[in-house]
């Protein structure tokens, strides 16, 4: 395990928000506007009229729904302009037709989007919360960073605001994919004046004075040895001998009242890999977190 030698500066130039114009989309909208304003980035507000539901209804019905979406976009833009929310922001509304993720992915590539804000209503399944289908596709397949405001995210304050006593949580298992997100976590903490808590969960129950526990704690300190964190970080090793590791991460996040969680994801191009491995833990955290979660693809 080597120390992180430098810190990246994620200079975001473009932010994408996928919206359905519903009341539930207002919180992700506030986050997206705040992030774009902080970085001076262009914000794209996109709505895709899914062609899936209009297969039998025909092209006229699809075009009618698209025109209605354009009117909704115009009303939203008018409201945001009148409130001053768009003042000084370079912005663009995009209305598309087709398979939702395919259209969004095309926008990401064409506009070189650096971060997509992923809002979701979510739904409850057996013993867990699930993201909606489009939100899940964004989480699993987007090449850019994904800022997910999950179904359990209750925070009113935006994670992008510079406020005193902010806390960001970086959860790592020390894999290459996980540590790929660390420089971004350090940069975000510095950007927003937050304390960064580095967390590792041991899936065993060693004594806190054992070599395994000590090595994990030392590992957290080592990866930040050459960093330039403005606020002194905190290092936490939790034990999870039973149950999912995600539950311990969520429990720690709640106890510390964190404002943002940052995690790394490995890259996969295979749809078959989208079930639960290797991103099961991150997916469960996104679904259950009471704050937004940023995931960074390796």
Predicted regions mapped to residue ranges:
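Small/aliphatic-rich secondary-structure junction motif
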Residues: 2-63, 163-211, 224-234, 288-289
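Rossmann-fold cofactor-recognition segment
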Residues: 90-94, 233-238
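Short glycine-rich, flexible loops that bind phosphorylated cofactors or substrates
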Residues: 24, 124-125, 177, 245, ...
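Charged docking surfaces used in two-component/phosphorelay signaling
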Residues: 95-103, 238-248
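Active-site phosphate/pyrophosphate- and oxyanion-stabilizing loops and adjacent acidic/basic residues
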Residues: 78, 136, 186, 225, ...
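Short, hinge-like loop/turn segments at secondary-structure boundaries
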Residues: 60-64, 111, 134-135, 163-167, ...
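A short acidic, glycine-rich active-site loop
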Residues: 62-75, 211
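Gly/Ser-rich helix-loop-strand patches that form or flank binding pockets
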Residues: 1-6, 11, 38, 105-157, ...
């Amino acid at each position: 395990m080597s120390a992180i030698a430098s810190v990246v500066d994620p200079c975001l130039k473009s932010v994408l928000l996928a919206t359905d114009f519903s009341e539930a989309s207002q919180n992700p909208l506030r986050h997206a506007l705040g992030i774009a304003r902080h970085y001076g980035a262009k914000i794209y507000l996109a709505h895709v009229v899914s062609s899936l539901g209009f297969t039998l209804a025909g092209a006229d019905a699809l075009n009618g729904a698209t025109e209605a979406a354009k009117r909704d976009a115009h009303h939203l833009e008018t409201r945001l302009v009148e409130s001053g929310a768009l003042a000084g922001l370079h912005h663009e509304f995009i209305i598309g037709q087709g398979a939702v993720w395919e259209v969004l992915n095309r926008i990401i590539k064409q506009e070189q989007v650096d971060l997509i804000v992923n809002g979701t209503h979510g739904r409850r399944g057996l013993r867990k919360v699930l993201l909606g289908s489009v939100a899940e596709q964004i989480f699993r397949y987007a090449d850019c960073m994904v800022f997910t405001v999950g179904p359990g995210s209750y925070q009113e304050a935006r994670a992008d605001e510079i406020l005193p006593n902010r806390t960001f949580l970086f959860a790592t298992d020390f894999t290459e994919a996980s540590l790929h997100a660390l420089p971004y976590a350090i940069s975000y903490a510095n950007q927003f004046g937050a304390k960064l808590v580095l967390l590792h969960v041991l899936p065993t129950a060693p004594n806190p004075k054992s070599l395994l526990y000590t090595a994990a704690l030392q590992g957290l300190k080592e990866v930040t040895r050459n960093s330039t964190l403005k606020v002194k970080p905190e290092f936490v090793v939790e034990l999870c001998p039973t149950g999912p590791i995600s539950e311990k991460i969520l429990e720690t996040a709640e106890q510390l009242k964190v404002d943002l969680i940052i995690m790394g994801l490995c890259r996969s191009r295979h749809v078959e890999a989208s079930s639960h491995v290797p991103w099961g833990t991150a997916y469960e955290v996104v679904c259950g977190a009471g704050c937004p979660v940023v995931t960074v693809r390796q």
